[in-house]
């Protein structure tokens, strides 16, 4: 009877992929029955229900096999995010860069203090603050399309989101030595690991970005192969980052930044991933929900609420402060700050990195960060809609959008 499967049955990666997609699609469908509940929250709730804290269909071993799928999802999302950071725009509008750095710094300082007062060790509080300074472009782009928003606030906020995520990773890397020291790591790990991961990921991302640009530029007549070059470049970069123990988050982010700033005609950055991109997006959030520990989430619920309120005030306050100093319109500053409130991809990725480097801190950090992600992705859409109306940019986009532009907008929102 050797031909029969062993018991208990173990799932391979392909089975896990199918399971995550089916469960995620179910969660997304159910979320559509409630107008106030975004699909992202539905994905996370279904993951929590079927994860180790719920029905345990997705146990720890199954989730471990989904890592490659989550890495691909994060790589694609962060590559798209990197395409939002145009350095020439920052040179033209210096105050935009100052605004991004000031708002990010204020958020890190305030969140660190609040979490420290709440009982977190100072290094861990700083690490969580570095994670949650990141912002998600998904809500911004999706709601902008829904309300037909267009204008200065809409475009410049994309750059601020990219700045937030770069600052998040840099601050996370800078704070790693403090957490490692408090965890009793060796000095070689404390000093060399963050340096190696940061500069190694930077070099890998720059190299991959240059290669993707050259390949797509030299073969620009064969447009049918551009998507293969881009997807292949992102996956190769993510894979090499794992092989060399670099950051599978920062490297694809840098890849996107390099491609965007090398090209002159946006031929690569406008490439559409298509509906298949949504599949990995579903996998990412179902996996994130499954990794939540219900007991820790309930225990730390007051901290999550405190984090949500404090981070929101810091984001808006930082942008408004710089705008006031530069005499910019208050309504536009408040709108930008509100559009920076949603949080998702980078935060989830850095939470996974924290769990890998510091298993003893994984449960509490995941409960706080992922709990906040669920809240921010729920309140994000109505906040964004209000922000676009406040800025006076809702309804300003062309009423008749081309199918190509529409596909690009929807894809980026994913």
Please report, for each region that a protein language model flagged, where it lies by residue.
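Interfacial loop-to-helix junctions that mark the boundaries of transmembrane helices
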Residues: 3-13, 35, 58-70, 97, ...
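Core mid-bundle transmembrane helix pairs that form the ion/substrate translocation pathway
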Residues: 12-29, 162, 166-169, 173-283, ...
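Membrane-interface junctions of multi-pass transporters
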Residues: 31-38, 49-95, 216-225, 233-307, ...
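Membrane-interfacial segments at transmembrane helix termini in multi-pass membrane proteins
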Residues: 212-221, 257-275, 312, 316-340, ...
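Hydrophobic alpha-helical transmembrane segments in multi-pass integral membrane proteins
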Residues: 56, 110-116, 168-179, 235-248, ...
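Entry/N-cap segments of selected transmembrane alpha helices
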Residues: 3, 12-27, 68, 86-117, ...
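Short helical (or helix-break) motifs at transmembrane helix termini and adjacent helical loops
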Residues: 81, 106-112, 131-172, 313-322, ...
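Juxtamembrane helix-boundary/capping and inter-helix hinge elements in multi-pass membrane proteins
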Residues: 83-96, 118-123, 143-155, 176-187, ...
């Amino acid at each position: 009877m050797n031909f029969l499967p062993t018991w208990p049955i173990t799932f391979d990666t392909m089975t896990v992929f199918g399971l995550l997609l089916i469960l995620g699609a179910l969660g997304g469908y159910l979320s559509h029955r409630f107008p106030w509940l975004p699909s992202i929250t539905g994905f996370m709730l279904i993951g929590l229900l079927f994860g180790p804290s719920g029905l345990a269909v997705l146990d720890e071993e199954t989730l471990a096999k989904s890592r490659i799928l989550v890495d691909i999802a994060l790589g694609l999302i962060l590559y798209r995010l990197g395409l939002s950071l145009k350095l020439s725009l920052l040179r033209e509008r210096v105050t935009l860069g100052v605004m991004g750095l000031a708002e990010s710094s204020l958020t890190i300082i305030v969140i660190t203090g609040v979490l420290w007062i709440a009982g977190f060790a100072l290094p861990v509080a700083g690490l969580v603050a570095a994670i949650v300074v990141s912002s998600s472009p998904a809500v911004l782009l999706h709601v902008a399309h829904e309300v037909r928003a267009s204008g200065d606030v809409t475009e410049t906020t994309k750059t601020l989101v990219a700045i937030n995520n770069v600052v998040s990773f840099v601050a996370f890397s800078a704070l790693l030595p403090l957490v490692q020291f408090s965890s009793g790591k060796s000095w070689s790990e404390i000093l060399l690991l963050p340096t190696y991961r940061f500069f190694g990921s930077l070099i890998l991302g720059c190299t991959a970005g240059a290669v993707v640009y050259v390949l797509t530029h030299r073969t620009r007549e064969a447009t049918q192969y551009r998507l293969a070059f881009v997807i292949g470049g992102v996956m190769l970069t993510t894979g090499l980052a794992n092989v060399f123990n670099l950051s599978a988050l920062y490297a694809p982010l840098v890849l996107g930044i390099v491609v965007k700033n090398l090209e002159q005609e946006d031929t690569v950055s406008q490439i559409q991933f298509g509906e298949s991109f949504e599949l990995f997006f579903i996998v990412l959030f179902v996996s994130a929900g499954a990794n939540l520990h219900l007991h820790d989430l309930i225990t730390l619920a007051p901290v999550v609420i405190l984090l949500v309120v404090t981070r929101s005030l810091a984001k808006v306050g930082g942008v408004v402060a710089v705008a006031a100093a530069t005499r910019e319109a208050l309504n536009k500053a408040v709108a930008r700050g509100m559009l920076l409130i949603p949080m998702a991809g980078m935060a989830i990725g850095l939470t996974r990195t924290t769990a890998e480097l510091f298993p003893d801190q994984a449960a509490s950090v995941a409960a706080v960060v992922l709990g906040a992600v669920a809240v921010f992705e729920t309140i994000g859409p109505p906040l964004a809609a209000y922000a676009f109306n406040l800025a006076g940019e809702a309804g300003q986009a062309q009423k008749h959008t081309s199918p190509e532009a529409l596909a690009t907008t929807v894809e980026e929102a994913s």
